[in-house]
């Protein structure tokens, strides 16, 4: 199974005598059927993307041609690409971008909780702890200009404690 499409490696029958089972914009496709199948998951994707594709009820199989397979896959991946392009063109006015704390481990979340003395009940699960910490994280006031100025100053002066601690500040080359 590849992206919801059956590759046919699980199925040893040949499809050389079959045509695509899809009706494209009210016209039955006449292309040779490949090994990709028109599963319920793919049907759901087609419906969500409002493609004018439907399965021919007269067809005795669910195999589709390579053209329709590629068309469905391109619609599925186009959304991901569009999202990633949108992310790269973000402006500085979007101040509501927060890190994904749900990816952090429980020990890291607990360390944050201890450091900022966040009040929580005992025995919280990771997702609940991340929710509580995210609420606290959003309330922390920051002075962006001051932070950036301090960062640039520290870099120029070469006095970053973390670099010196890791041996990076003692560069002799």
Swiss-Prot record:
Main location: nucleus
Stored Pfam families: SAP30_Sin3_bdg, zf-SAP30
GO biological process, one term: regulation of G2/M transition of mitotic cell cycle
Subcellular location: Nucleus
Loss of function: phenotype: Does not cause cell morphology changes, cell growth defects, cell cycle phenotypes, or loss of Smr/SMRTER protein from the Sin3A-histone deacetylase (HDAC1/Rpd3) complex.
Residues bearing the modification Phosphothreonine: 91, 93
GO cellular component: histone deacetylase complex
Family classification: Belongs to the SAP30 family.
Subunit structure: Component of the class 1 Sin3A-histone deacetylase (HDAC1/Rpd3) complex (HDAC). Not essential for stability of the complex, recruitment of the complex to some promoters, or the deacetylase activity of the complex.
Protein name as catalogued: Histone deacetylase complex subunit SAP30 homolog
Species whose genome carries this gene: Drosophila melanogaster (Fruit fly)
Encoding gene, per UniProt annotation: Sap30
């Amino acid at each position: 199974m590849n992206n919801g499409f059956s590759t046919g490696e699980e199925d040893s029958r040949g499809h050389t005598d079959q045509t695509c089972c899809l009706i494209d914009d009210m016209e039955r496709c006449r292309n040779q059927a490949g090994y990709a199948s028109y599963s319920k998951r793919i049907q759901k994707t087609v419906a969500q993307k409002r493609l004018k594709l439907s399965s021919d009820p007269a067809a005795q199989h669910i195999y589709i041609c390579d053209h329709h397979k590629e068309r469905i896959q391109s619609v599925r991946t186009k959304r991901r690409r569009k999202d990633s392009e949108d992310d790269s063109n973000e402006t500085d006015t979007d101040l509501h971008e927060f890190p994904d704390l749900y990816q952090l481990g429980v020990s890291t979340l607990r360390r944050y909780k201890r450091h900022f003395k966040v009040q929580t009940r005992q025995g919280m699960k990771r997702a609940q702890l991340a929710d509580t910490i995210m609420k606290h994280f959003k309330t922390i006031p920051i002075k962006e200009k001051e932070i950036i100025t301090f960062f640039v100053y520290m870099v120029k002066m070469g006095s970053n404690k973390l670099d010196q601690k890791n041996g990076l500040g003692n560069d002799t080359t």
